Swiss-Prot record:
Segments for region (Disordered): 1-55, 70-164, 221-313
Keyword Methyltransferase: no
Ranges annotated as biased composition (Low complexity): 83-134, 221-235
Record key words, sorted: Coiled coil
Coiled-coil regions, chain positions: 390-423
UniProt-recorded name of the protein: Uncharacterized protein R558
Feature: compositional bias, Polar residues: 73-82, 288-306
Biased composition (Basic and acidic residues): 40-50, 141-150, 236-249, 259-275
């Protein structure tokens, strides 16, 4: 107890010294403690039982509301304990000793807990400050040695990617189909001959429109063309002066044999061997020019006399021609059907309504009475008759109408007779397989059977009655 009281007096003297310093300097503004550890130290000092009233007021004015409430409660508790100790002097010394020991233990535990809390808070703030400093240093180091981060570029959205895949698949399918068609066409087509340097130009073509497209079809060549070409080349020789030809007819004939050797054996071979003639003789030069022209004309005539091969039409064009012809045939069939269609295809229910509507419309459109009579007469007359109905008079139209009615009545009678079944006697007579005797027997049997049927029917009636 003595030790505890001495400690309390020391604490009070220290606090009084602090407060007296503050009161002596009124100009100074006291600031409350910032850290939690300092505030808790003030709380521990305030919990002591021997504080003065002016000290409590000072702390109450400068600390927050919650702290003041706690402080007042603790102060009141301490005062109650003092009163209790002063008034109750009759308690035993053992009880007082126990109470003091309890107080000492409580104070020790409070001091230990406060010290632990202060140590923990200080460690926590120190650790935070150290961590912050370490993090700052790490950030500076990373900024110095910072490398460019390769971020993944955002691709297009999934819908566009799927559309691209579908488009690529469609294009691949198309390319496959095109390759298949090309391979088929190449197999069907014959090997095309490559053009040579000596190849002649192709035959003339004719412009034709097939299925809305322009096509060029080759024209068949005839022997007339070859004759015209040869005649044109022969006319070139005639334009030259006739004097030179008259002077040297023998030389030309002799030179031709030398210039065109072996034409009968090798007609396709061009002129290769030509005898060298002296340059000094001018007549020989003229003969060479003329002989060359004759040789060329001879070769052209031989080449044109060959049979011309027919060029094949490509299969794609043939297919288009077939399709076009089939379309034309269908259109012609449809036109012919429309012409041949009669009113019989219309059902009888609707045919009468249609006829009535047509008659009403014609009667309404008629202006004069004579036209109306003509229209009514024409309605019952069929146009099958050979007479022009529009030019005929009304009297003629009436006659035609009567004749038509007679024909219709006769046709109806015939139809009724044809529909009736033949009698049994007529069927027997018309049967050529039977003899006359067999026919007579069959007819008698029919009459006998008919009598029996009548008798049976009569007996049945009597029995019922």
């Amino acid at each position: 107890m003595n030790s505890s009281n001495s400690n309390d007096h020391e604490n009070l003297s220290a606090q009084e010294f602090i407060i007296s310093d503050i009161e002596e300097d009124p100009d100074t503004n006291y600031e409350p403690p910032v850290n939690d550890s300092e505030s808790e130290n003030y709380k521990d000092n305030s919990d002591h039982s021997n504080h003065s009233s002016h000290q409590n007021k000072f702390y109450y004015q400068n600390f927050p509301e919650n702290f003041s409430k706690d402080f007042s409660e603790s102060f009141n508790d301490n005062q109650n304990l003092k009163n209790f100790n002063t008034t109750d002097n009759n308690f035993n010394d053992d009880y007082n000793n126990d109470y003091d020991s309890n107080n000492d233990s409580n104070n020790d535990s409070n001091n230990d807990s406060n010290n632990d809390y202060d140590n923990e808070s200080n460690n926590y703030f120190n650790n935070d400050s150290n961590n912050d400093s370490n993090n700052d240093s790490d950030i500076e180091e990373t900024t110095k040695h910072k490398l460019p981060i390769e971020r993944k570029k955002r691709g297009p959205p999934k819908s566009i990617v799927e559309g691209q895949k579908k488009y690529i698949e469609m294009m691949e399918r198309q390319n496959r189909m095109i390759k298949k068609d090309k391979n088929k066409s190449l197999k069907q087509m014959d090997a095309v001959k490559l053009p040579t340097s000596n190849a002649k130009p192709g035959p003339e073509t004719r412009r034709v429109i097939i299925g809305g497209k322009i096509k060029y079809i080759p024209i068949k060549t005839t022997d007339n063309q070859s004759n015209t070409e040869s005649s044109q080349e022969n006319n070139v020789i005639k334009k030259e002066p006739n004097n030179k030809l008259d002077k040297q007819p023998q030389k030309i004939s002799s030179n031709i044999k030398d210039i065109v050797p072996k034409q009968e054996t090798d007609k396709k071979s061009p002129v290769k061997s030509i005898k060298e003639l002296s340059v000094n003789e001018p007549d020989d030069i003229d003969s060479i020019d003329q002989s060359n022209k004759l040789g060329k004309s001879y070769n052209t005539n031989n080449n044109n006399s060959k049979p011309i091969e027919k060029q094949r039409v490509p299969p794609s064009l043939v297919k288009k021609m077939e399709v076009y012809n089939s379309k034309l045939a269908k259109e012609m069939n449809n036109i012919n059907r429309k012409k041949n269609i009669s009113g019989k295809n219309v059902p009888s229910k609707y045919a009468k309504h249609i006829e009535d509507d047509v008659r009403k419309q014609t009667v309404r459109n008629v202006k004069s009475f004579s036209d109306l009579r003509r229209v009514k007469a024409l309605q019952d007359i069929t146009p099958d008759s050979g007479v022009d109905v529009n030019k005929a008079s009304i009297a003629e139209l009436k006659k035609m109408r009567l004749e038509q009615r007679k024909r219709e009545i006769e046709e109806k009678r015939r139809q009724v007779e044809n529909k009736k079944p033949d009698s049994a006697v007529q069927a027997i007579l018309n049967n050529n397989d039977l003899s006359k005797f067999a026919k007579m027997v069959a007819i008698k049997n029919l009459s006998v059977n008919s009598r029996h049927r009548k008798m049976k029917t009569g007996n049945n009636v009597l029995n019922k009655e």
